[in-house]
């Protein structure tokens, strides 16, 4: 075990632990059994039993440490001590390996350093780590390969050198001597296995460069083809993926008839159908995209193989081998279908006809005579997925044809121009010159006409009048989902994405259906993160292709930065960053949303927002300066913690470097004081001013605008920030300025004291007013409470009057009424003079 691969050490550690547990010293074994029995009787849980096991092992190890070899140990005790010593050694080795693994995290960061020497040293570490078989070497090299996209050529060369040293060359040979072919193939499979999409792209770039330079032996690809044919599990697909990467630089690796036959039999044949190995089918689609388009020739064996391959590609694209009862199967098929359709557009002589056959076949299988509500959701999802991807590929195919025509015309025009130059050199007749120039002008007109026709095809034909247009209304119906008739998450995800792909083709179709997409985004369930994340990415593509159509909906795109899902917020910020830096979206107006991302809970979101502002600050006009007033205003009006606000502004104000910008920003901030509705907003403004650099002109600006902020100086926060500005200004060491600063400081302190007195007086007046208001309210409440008593007494009086009328003669009625009135008057006089007078009258 001379290397640092942890696997054999872990296996040895397990063996030693098992030996110690089964060969405990007698005294420890008895104590262990007694403790275990007691624990079981007490009903202790598994965690307690595991702790007991660990304690027993610790006691056994301590017992072995106490043994002295010089004491003539018996063979059993000697063996036990030897095993325990081995166990301790192996555990120490694993701890040592863990130390290296933990340290590798810092080296990952060094790979991103702006200092090229840091990058070089980190690469050297991962090369050595690979030679010692440390696991961190592979993960480190995967991250290092992202530097293949660096603009610095020397960095790319260092990465390629490290790649060769780690995976291709014999250790210590400096890349001159190669490992055996099967070892190189194994290393490449290890690198590509379980790699992410971004990692695979970087690996492909590195392998392509090495193949062009001839630094990967040809026998390696023969071994990989054998692994594709006879491998097991995922190794087949991984081997074919690596082959496709190499074929990007050398088509001959895939293009021969025998290789194509292997692809047909292995990746698109019975094996894939039986095991539903969509990863292998996907790899086959990628590999076939490296092959030249088939030329119809029935006598050519290669064409006949390609013809059969195209048939199988259509079978895979239709989903004929999918299982409707298995959702995972369909999810894996999606990726394979995309690459297979891409391969059809590369190798098929007439890809549009092949795609039409796929669509008609899927339409019959999916809908047939049934309504859309009766269709199996997975079948419908597969159908929509194919529709969307074919629409997108038709657009790309149309534009590629336009490019081919444009290149042919350019070549033809260049030839005519050369002829014209030659004719002029020979002083030919002017009529001939005029004729050639006329032909050149006509060529330009023809080229413009061709481009117009291509644009018209994309705008009107693909999703407007062609076969795909038939299914546009169906897509819209499912995406809108009125009445919640479709409840399959996969169906809603694929239908929304397919509609977005349709919209990428035509600007008019896009403008018409943008409201549908945004309604679907708003109605998306909180649990369906995939739908919202995919929709945001699709909207980014639409904004890049049709910025004018998407521009009115920009605020709704920014609103996704407040989504509850971290994934959605990440994707939204990445999309907006891409659009803003490419000037496809205006940042002003919603910039506050991006500024808030600087304090997001997710580290990647915080880093991305920092990167965006950093890139903006590097532009000549420094947009950050122009955005700051809006950011300050909007952040002051929303509910945000003071520390968060100040953290955001401290970061952004650090980008204001020019003196003139500092002066103008201070003036703009001063003008905002009268517009503030609370003292906290004024404190925020003064904090921002305190972070800026000051000079004589900015100090004069603050002094001249004293009346704008004097009413806020009673606040300790506001006063403290102004005093900090004065402290910074005093360091300018100009005598005449120091006198002005002292006068300004004295003025600030006086106004602060006066403001505090006014504040206290106002608070006392408010307290007195509140107390008077309480008394008035209490008096009114008492009056309201007496009304029911008055009504009750009036009812009593009415009852008495009724009794008197019933008991007396009519001739004495007048006398009795007067008597009762006198009684009422007497009662009422207790409650108020007004009521008493009324009764008396």
Predicted regions and their residues:
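Acidic, serine/threonine/proline-rich low-complexity intrinsically disordered regions
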Residues: 441-445, 799-827
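Extended alpha-solenoid helical-repeat scaffolds
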Residues: 1-796, 800, 804
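A positional/structural detector of protein chain ends, strongest at the extreme C-terminus
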Residues: 839-841
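Compositionally biased, intrinsically disordered low-complexity regions
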Residues: 4, 45, 809, 834-836
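Arg/Lys-rich low-complexity patches in intrinsically disordered regions that function as generic
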Residues: 772-781, 816-834
């Amino acid at each position: 075990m001379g290397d640092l691969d942890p696997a054999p050490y872990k296996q040895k550690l397990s063996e030693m632990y098992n030996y110690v547990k089964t060969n405990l010293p007698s005294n420890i074994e008895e104590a262990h059994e007694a403790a275990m029995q007691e624990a079981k009787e007490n009903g202790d849980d598994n965690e307690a039993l595991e702790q007991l096991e660990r304690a027993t092992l610790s006691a056994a190890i301590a017992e072995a440490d106490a043994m002295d070899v010089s004491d003539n140990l018996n063979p059993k005790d000697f063996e036990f001590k030897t095993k325990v010593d081995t166990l301790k050694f192996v555990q120490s080795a694993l701890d040592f390996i863990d130390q290296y693994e933990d340290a590798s995290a810092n080296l990952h960061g060094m790979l991103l350093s702006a200092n090229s020497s840091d990058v070089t040293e980190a690469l050297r570490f991962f090369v050595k780590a690979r030679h010692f078989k440390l696991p961190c070497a592979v993960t480190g090299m995967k991250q290092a390969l992202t530097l293949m996209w660096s603009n610095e050529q020397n960095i790319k060369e260092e990465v390629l050198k490290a790649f060769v040293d780690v995976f291709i060359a014999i250790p210590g040979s400096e890349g001159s001597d190669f490992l055996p072919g099967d070892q190189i193939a194994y290393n490449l499979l290890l690198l590509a296995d379980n790699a992410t999409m971004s990692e695979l792209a970087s690996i492909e770039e590195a392998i392509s460069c090495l193949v062009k330079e001839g630094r990967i032996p040809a026998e390696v690809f023969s071994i990989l083809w054998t692994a594709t044919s006879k491998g097991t599990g995922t190794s087949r697909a991984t081997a074919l993926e690596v082959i496709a990467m190499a074929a990007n630089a050398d088509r001959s690796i895939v293009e021969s008839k025998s290789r194509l036959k292997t692809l047909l039999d292995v990746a698109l044949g019975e094996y894939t159908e039986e095991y539903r190995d969509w990863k292998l089918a996907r790899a086959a689609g990628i590999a076939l995209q490296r092959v030249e388009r088939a030329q119809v020739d029935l006598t050519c064996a290669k064409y006949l193989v390609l013809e059969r391959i195209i048939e199988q590609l259509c079978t895979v694209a239709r989903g004929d081998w999918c299982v409707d009862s298995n959702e995972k199967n369909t999810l894996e098929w999606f990726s394979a279908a995309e690459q297979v359709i891409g391969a059809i557009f590369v190798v098929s002589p007439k890809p549009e006809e092949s795609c039409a056959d796929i669509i008609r076949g899927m339409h019959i299988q999916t809908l047939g005579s049934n309504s859309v509500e009766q269709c199996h959701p997975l079948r419908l999802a597969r159908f929509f997925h194919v529709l969307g991807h074919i629409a997108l590929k038709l657009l790309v195919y149309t534009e590629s044809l336009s490019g081919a025509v444009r290149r042919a015309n350019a070549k033809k025009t260049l030839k005519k121009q050369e002829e014209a130059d030659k004719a002029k050199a020979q002083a030919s007749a002017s009529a001939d010159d005029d004729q050639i120039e006329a032909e050149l002008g006509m060529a330009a007109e023809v080229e413009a006409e061709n481009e117009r026709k291509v644009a018209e095809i994309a705008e009107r034909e693909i999703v407007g009048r062609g076969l795909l247009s038939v299914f546009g209304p169906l897509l819209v119906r499912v995406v809108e989902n009125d009445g919640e008739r479709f409840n399959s998450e996969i169906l809603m995800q694929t239908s929304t994405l397919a509609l977005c792909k349709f919209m990428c083709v035509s600007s008019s179709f896009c403008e018409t259906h943008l409201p549908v997409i945004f309604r679907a985004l708003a109605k998306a369930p909180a649990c369906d993160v995939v739908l919202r994340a995919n929709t945001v990415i699709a909207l980014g593509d639409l904004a890049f292709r049709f910025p004018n159509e998407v521009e009115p909906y920009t605020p709704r795109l920014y609103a996704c930065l407040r989504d509850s899902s971290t994934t959605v917020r990440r994707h939204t910020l990445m999309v907006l960053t891409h659009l803003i830096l490419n000037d496809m979206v205006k940042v002003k107006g919603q910039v506050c949303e991006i500024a808030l991302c600087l304090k997001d809970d997710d580290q990647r979101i915080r880093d991305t927002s920092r990167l965006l502002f950093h890139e903006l600050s590097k532009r000549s006009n420094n947009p950050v300066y122009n955005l700051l007033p809006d950011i300050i205003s909007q952040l002051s009006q929303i509910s945000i913690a003071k520390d968060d606000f100040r953290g955001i502004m401290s970061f952004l104000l650090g980008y204001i470097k020019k003196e003139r910008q500092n002066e103008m920003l201070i003036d703009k901030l001063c003008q905002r004081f009268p517009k503030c509705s609370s003292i906290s907003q004024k404190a925020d403004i003064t904090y921002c001013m305190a972070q800026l650099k000051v000079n004589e002109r900015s100090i004069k600006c603050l002094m001249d605008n004293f009346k704008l902020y004097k009413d806020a100086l009673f606040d300790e926060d506001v006063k403290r920030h102004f005093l900090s500005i004065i402290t910074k200004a005093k360091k300018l060491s100009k005598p005449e300025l120091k006198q002005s600063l002292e006068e300004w400081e004295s003025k600030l302190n006086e106004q602060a004291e006066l403001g505090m007195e006014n504040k206290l007086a106002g608070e006392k007046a408010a307290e007195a007013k509140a107390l008077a208001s309480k008394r008035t309210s209490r008096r009114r409440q008492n009056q309201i409470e007496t009304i029911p008593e008055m009504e009750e007494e009036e009812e009593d009086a009415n009852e008495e009057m009724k009794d008197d009328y019933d008991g007396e003669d009519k001739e004495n009625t007048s006398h009795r009424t007067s008597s009762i009135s006198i009684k009422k008057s007497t009662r009422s006089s207790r409650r108020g003079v007004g009521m008493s007078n009324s009764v008396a009258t």
